């Protein structure tokens, strides 16, 4: 069997779709996940901590979920701020497909699940919420942060959770 990671663009592992119950914006919902994505069996502890400790997002603007996986952060942002555009960014095409599927199931039309190069270069973000892909390595993670943090607008904030020393 081929070896891959959740940060592989096209995972070689079997998709193995599954349905899990997770809290999104204060209510329990059932969402789709799959093998070859980050934490396919449950909402991971880091994301849970992030979602439980961030303030209510602004009502509108462009928001970024960097390293979105199957979408719990992006879906929470989109639910809490229906007038916002939520950019769910990942390299993993399987994860992006799951975000789209989950957003459709929840009736969220304000989620854009895309690769980094599909985000228009002139978009400035009102907030960034992320459980970044730390397993890509320290140098690549720093590159991600140096790429996206300057795209915060002047009224913005960023909320990140990391479970390892960087």
Regions found by a protein language model. Name each.
Residues 1-25, 36-40:
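N-terminal auxiliary segments of SAM/dcSAM-dependent transferases
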Residues 27-29:
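Well-ordered beta-strand scaffold positions
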Residues 34-52:
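Conserved SAM-binding loop and adjacent beta-strand
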Residues 46-122, 127-130, 136:
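Conserved SAM/SAH cofactor-binding pocket of Class I
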Residues 134-135, 163-166:
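Short "lid" loop at the C-terminus of a central beta-strand within the Rossmann-like core
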Residues 138-140:
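Glycine/threonine-rich flexible loop motifs
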Residues 142-154:
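A short glycine-rich, Lys/Arg-flanked "PGG" loop and its adjoining helix->strand segment in the class I
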Residues 155-162:
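Conserved beta-strand signature within the Rossmann-like core of class I S-adenosyl-L-methionine
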């Amino acid at each position: 069997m081929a070896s891959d990671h959740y940060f592989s663009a096209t995972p070689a592992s079997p998709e193995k779709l599954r349905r899990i119950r997770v809290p999104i914006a204060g209510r329990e919902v059932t969402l789709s996940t799959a093998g070859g994505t980050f934490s396919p069996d449950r909402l991971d502890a880091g994301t849970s901590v992030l979602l439980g400790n961030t303030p209510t997002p602004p009502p509108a603007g462009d928001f970024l979920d960097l390293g979105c996986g199957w979408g719990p952060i992006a879906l929470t942002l989109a639910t809490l701020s229906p007038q916002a555009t939520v950019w769910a960014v990942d390299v993993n095409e399987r994860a992006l497909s799951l975000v789209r599927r989950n957003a459709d199931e929840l009736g969220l039309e304000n989620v854009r699940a895309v690769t980094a190069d599909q985000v228009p270069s002139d978009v400035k973000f009102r907030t960034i919420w992320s459980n970044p892909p730390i397993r890509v390595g320290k140098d690549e993670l720093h590159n991600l942060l140096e790429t996206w943090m300057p795209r915060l607008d002047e009224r913005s904030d960023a909320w990140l959770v990391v479970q390892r020393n960087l």
